[in-house]
From Swiss-Prot:
InterPro entries found in the cross-reference section: Svp26/Tex261
Key word Cell cycle present: no
Top-level taxonomy: Eukaryota, Metazoa, Chordata, Craniata, Vertebrata
Name of the protein in question: Protein TEX261
Organism per entry: Pongo abelii (Sumatran orangutan)
Keywords, ordered alphabetically: Membrane, Transmembrane, Transmembrane helix
One GO term of the biological process aspect: endoplasmic reticulum to Golgi vesicle-mediated transport
Length: 196
């Protein structure tokens, strides 16, 4: 009896580890795709916002969801369109980004309050949360790294922090300590040159 109980906990641990690794690998691959195809990603996010808007309008017309919840959801989608204007460069300190984060919290509060008072099956509640609350912020979250398009191979020689600090803009003059640091940098981290 105890042996089977121990095996069940061990198998649960292994399954959770595999699921976590699979989700991490999927997110990494998705982030790579978003970074590679930013224009297509922007278009997909725009269509997702339109779809979420249509779902919110449908919930208001057909299901009689509260006006406040639908209104805040539609306003949040407008803020998402504002974020999309500068995509893939999203400033975490911009008022638009901060407002969208605040509206996500407000939307969750209104949805939890509504679904606590009104009974809906779990699958319908999950559908609302997925299409109206989670999918667009998740898309923006995964694409946050797409604006960081500075790759190590695009760096110009001598543009590293050490070189800029010691030369202070004087490229022609090389001081003794700079030569030592350049030698150490090339010895430890050799730059990769493309050979054709």
């Amino acid at each position: 009896m105890w042996f089977m109980y121990l095996l069940s906990w061990l198998s649960l641990f292994i399954q959770v580890a595999f699921i976590t690794l699979a989700v991490a690998a999927g997110l990494y691959y998705l982030a790579e795709l978003i970074e590679e195809y930013t224009v297509a990603t922007s278009r997909i996010i725009k269509y997702m916002i339109w779809f979420s808007t249509a779902v919110l309008i449908g919930l208001y017309v057909f299901e009689r969801f509260p006006t406040s919840m639908i209104g805040v959801g539609l306003f949040t989608n407008l803020v998402y369109f504002g974020l999309l204007q500068t995509f893939p460069f999203i400033m975490l300190t911009s008022p638009n980004f901060i407002l969208s984060c605040g509206l996500v919290v407000v939307n969750h509060y209104l949805a939890c309050q509504f679904f606590a008072e009104e009974y809906y099956p779990f699958s319908e509640v999950l559908a609302y949360f997925t299409f109206c609350l989670w999918i667009i912020p998740f898309a923006f979250f995964v694409s946050l790294s797409a604006g960081e398009n500075v790759l190590p191979s695009t760096m110009q020689p001598g543009d590293d922090v050490v070189s800029n600090y010691f030369t202070k803009g004087k490229r022609g003059k090389r001081l003794g300590i700079l030569v030592v640091f350049s030698f150490i940098k090339e010895a430890i981290l050799p730059s990769r040159q493309k050979i054709y």
